[in-house]
Amino acid sequence: MHAMESRVLLRTFCVILGLGAVWGLGVDPSLQIDVLTELELGESTDGVRQVPGLHNGTKAFLFQESPRSIKASTATAERFFQKLRNKHEFTILVTLKQIHLNSGVILSIHHLDHRYLELESSGHRNEIRLHYRSGTHRPHTEVFPYILADAKWHKLSLAFSASHLILHIDCNKIYERVVEMPSTDLPLGTTFWLGQRNNAHGYFKGIMQDVHVLVMPQGFIAQCPDLNRTCPTCNDFHGLVQKIMELQDILSKTSAKLSRAEQRMNRLDQCYCERTCTVKGTTYRESESWTDGCKNCTCLNGTIQCETLVCPAPDCPPKSAPAYVDGKCCKECKSTCQFQGRSYFEGERNTVYSSSGMCVLYECKDQTMKLVENIGCPPLDCPESHQIALSHSCCKVCKGYDFCSEKHTCMENSVCRNLNDRAVCSCRDGFRALREDNAYCEDIDECAEGRHYCRENTMCVNTPGSFMCICKTGYIRIDDYSCTEHDECLTNQHNCDENALCFNTVGGHNCVCKPGYTGNGTTCKAFCKDGCRNGGACIAANVCACPQGFTGPSCETDIDECSEGFVQCDSRANCINLPGWYHCECRDGYHDNGMFAPGGESCEDIDECGTGRHSCTNDTICFNLDGGYDCRCPHGKNCTGDCVHEGKVKHTGQIWVLENDRCSVCSCQTGFVMCRRMVCDCENPTVDLSCCPECDPRLSSQCLHQNGETVYNSGDTWVQDCRQCRCLQGEVDCWPLACPEVECEFSVLPENECCPRCVTDPCQADTIRNDITKTCLDEMNVVRFTGSSWIKHGTECTLCQCKNGHLCCSVDPQCLQEL
């Protein structure tokens, strides 16, 4: 296939994909949100009414004066967000006609104070603003200079494709930018507003029609079918890059696992480990069984598990009977002898005395009682009255003889006890007999059988031959069997926060935060009624610790370092106050040489004559001066003193209003153009209130601060969340603060500050540029793209990142504590 044919097929494929999704704005409802239809606006909706639109195909609505509340219901908003949530390719489409000088919100998606997506048009500053939150949850604002509030119909399209942003106005591509990728991970409770930010702010005034959100690539085609399409989109490309990064991560993890597996295999080749059990010096292998007294035991996973032996009744032949055998738990058949009307077991002896008193000893052998030869008896060292005759021996013993010292059958947990003429077995305390001769005994579980003396507030724990009474949590011991409540508060053995009160309870305690603090008792944080603004921290009840550059009970007041003399800028620079900071900005006629010295020392003169940045006409000669220039008339020549401004000749003494700013006037003074804001004379009844809002005395022109408490007069200005705000005839208009140019490779936005600063260490930079050509080589020699992160091989708490082609690793202290 030729290259030309390939390109044609690819383009055709992209066009088919695009048209199949958007044709007629109704083919695939799952990809679009028809906002006006879903909100069910009508004549009964306060603040809006239906009016003729740009066309008659759909309804158009006039958004009138406040108050109004055009907000999607919870169910409707959630339907919107289900389509939008976690999508990186979507387009906002709207047809509108906004009245002159209105500053209003077209649509807003926000949760609490976090604006996830808000589109705003300012007629005061002639710009379109996009407010959004990135994937790092940081707020961003993109400003597009454009006059949208001109009382004319416009078609607006704002298309997102991952980090690619395109703004079309009336089917013309106005702006195309690479931005931080917006976050569409919308939490529950997020709200959707149309034509306003909330009930009190951002009222759009004008007409809206065809308000749609399309969750698809190149949604602007629905509004302008003839526009060019790009295939693949930025989001497609970003997805491919993301997949490559994921595959790299999988490869790295797989390599690490393989390396660890090889190490383990090498160790396993050197040794063989098997779990065994050792009993009384004998070692048993896994699953091996044995008999231990009256129990059958098995070695399972290195643990001994035993069950009581069940003894079957033996079926003995004639001249035999069941009897215990040494070393065996169960009875076995044993031969018997009949003698003098009684049965004797094999080996059992009995004495018989003759009429003369002579002792004869018999023993059962081969089922017959046979005479045992008398070998004589040892002498006794006790009187005859203390001598005892035995039934199994002709030799007497002294009273107190230790029969247990001879051979006996008492096994583990059984003890031998001496009687007057023999030895018997007896179970130890806490054990019970497993057979009638007490030779074998087992532990009694006093806890399970209720044979313990543990009282309330204790737990019974069985031990070999006994039990223990353990105190329950929150109790302390009185004696071996009882416990009483423990006052953790009194003994300071509680987990309450230092700013909490401890209350003792039965079996425990409760923690309650002190007045002025909030939390669950174990953790209490200071509570400041009015909050701490501008990054301040509440450190005690209604006490804010303000960051550098702010002061006031709530850190609401910016310290003007310039006017209060805290800083001294170079003579070639002016001190510009910023919220929490300041900036030495080069004065007119100077520019920075690229060193960006904080005090303005790097400001140097601009050669207006050499660069053409002057207003001298052709009949004069431009002479450069330090911080300016001079238009000089050649000797002997009569010069007009005219000026050149924006390509047009202005005569000396001429005054004119700027075309793009009706509130500024300029004049030509002997070759120099001087421009300034219009002087506001509030005594003049014809004063332009749009240029001089401070001259508007009407209460209806006052504005309410975003906190809902402070009231401003028309013309007042203030700073709110790194934005400059102004009250203009009842409308609040806010725009991002103008930050000094940061012309360095790496920058960082310090916490609680509004403007970025330069840093030399790329690992300190918090901005990761969208440049996949910059890569890093990790410790496993795997190539990583800029923006990727991973846990360093061989560690658990070392996080590495590839930032702008630089490898940056750091140890997480919290992770180390959790190990």
UniProtKB/Swiss-Prot annotation:
Homotrimer. Interacts with NICOL1; this interaction triggers epididymal differentiation. Interacts (via EGF domains) with ROBO3 (via FN domains); binding to ROBO3 induces repulsive guidance cue for commissural axons. It comes from the Eukaryota. PROSITE patterns: ASX_HYDROXYL, EGF_1, EGF_2, EGF_3, EGF_CA, VWFC_1, VWFC_2. Residues 275-334, 701-759 form the VWFC domain. It comes from Mus musculus (Mouse). Residues 67-231 form the Laminin G-like domain. Disruption phenotype: Deficient male mice exhibit infertility, impaired binding of sperm to zona pellucida, and impaired sperm migration in female genital tract. Postnatal differentiation of the initial segment (IS) of the caput epididymis is completely abolished in Nell2 deficient males and continued throughout life. Ovch2 is not secreted and Adam3 is not processed into its mature form in cauda epididymal spermatozoa, leading to inability of spermatozoa to pass through the uterotubal junction and to bind to the zona pellucida. One of its GO terms (biological process) is neuron cellular homeostasis. Ca(2+) binds at residues 443-444, 446, 462-463, 466, 558-559, 561, 577-578, 581, 605-606, 608, 624-625, 628. Residues 400-442, 443-484, 485-525, 526-556, 558-604, 605-640 form the EGF-like domain. Keywords: Calcium, Disulfide bond, EGF-like domain, Glycoprotein, Metal-binding, Repeat, Secreted, Signal. The lineage of its organism: Eukaryota, Metazoa, Chordata, Craniata, Vertebrata. This is Protein kinase C-binding protein NELL2. CDD domains: EGF_CA (cd00054), LamG (cd00110). The keyword Cell wall biogenesis/degradation does not apply.
